[in-house]
From Swiss-Prot:
Entry protein name: Protein GrpE
Keywords, in A-Z order: Chaperone, Cytoplasm, Stress response
Gene assigned in the entry: grpE
Species, as recorded: Helicobacter pylori (strain P12)
GO BP terms: protein folding
Family as reported in the entry's similarity comment: Belongs to the GrpE family.
Length: 191
């Protein structure tokens, strides 16, 4: 029995180096496979990060484009409203002129009549509404300003110096600071 045991032990001892070689080869193969898997994982990770970065940059560009379009639409909408208000204001100017003419005619006949008072009140209310919407009359003080006044004629005037406004022939209006219609005036010429 001892002999059998020794033979078996010798047989195992002979197989041990062979087993070690196989185990080492297997371990090396596992290490190589692990290294390949790790390299593949790194490549996948790098590829994912690159695609993520590209997608993020595309998102930022699309978002910026969207914001620019949104701003442009808001600006266009605002400009369209401004244009509409300006157009309405221009269309109202002849009505205002007619109302002012009626008031002046009525005031010449009877300044205290109900008609004159009604026209005056209507003019005041109309100017209040127009002012609320940025439409206001151009002031025609002493100085002539070609940006706001249009000189229709020159008249001799002993009371005014050359180039000063003598009379307003037609009221001018501006919308939010921009001239809708210049005031038509006569200016003094004393040569």
């Amino acid at each position: 029995m001892k002999d059998e045991h020794n033979q078996e032990h010798d047989h195992l001892s002979q197989k041990e180096p062979e087993f070690c070689e196989k185990a080492c080869a297997c371990k090396e193969q596992q290490n190589e496979e692990m290294q390949e898997a790790s390299e593949k994982e790194c490549e996948i990770k790098e590829d994912f990060e690159l695609k993520y970065k590209e997608m993020h940059e595309k998102y930022l560009r699309v978002h910026a484009d969207f914001e620019n379009v949104k701003k442009r639409l808001e600006r266009d909408k605002s400009m369209a409203l401004e244009y509409a208000y300006e157009k309405i204001a221009l269309d109202l100017l002849p009505v205002i002129d007619a109302l002012l003419g009626a008031y002046k005619s009525a005031a010449e006949v009877d300044k205290e009549s109900a008609l004159t008072k009604g026209l005056e009140l209507t003019m005041e209310k109309l100017h209040e509404v127009l002012a609320r919407h940025g439409i206001e009359g151009i002031e025609c003080l002493e100085e002539f300003d070609p940006n706001f006044h249009n000189a229709i004629m020159q008249v001799k005037s002993e009371e005014k110096e050359n180039g000063k406004i003598v009379q307003v022939l037609q009221q001018g209006y501006k919308y939010k600071g921009r001239v809708l219609r210049p005031a038509m005036v006569s200016i003094a010429k004393n040569d």
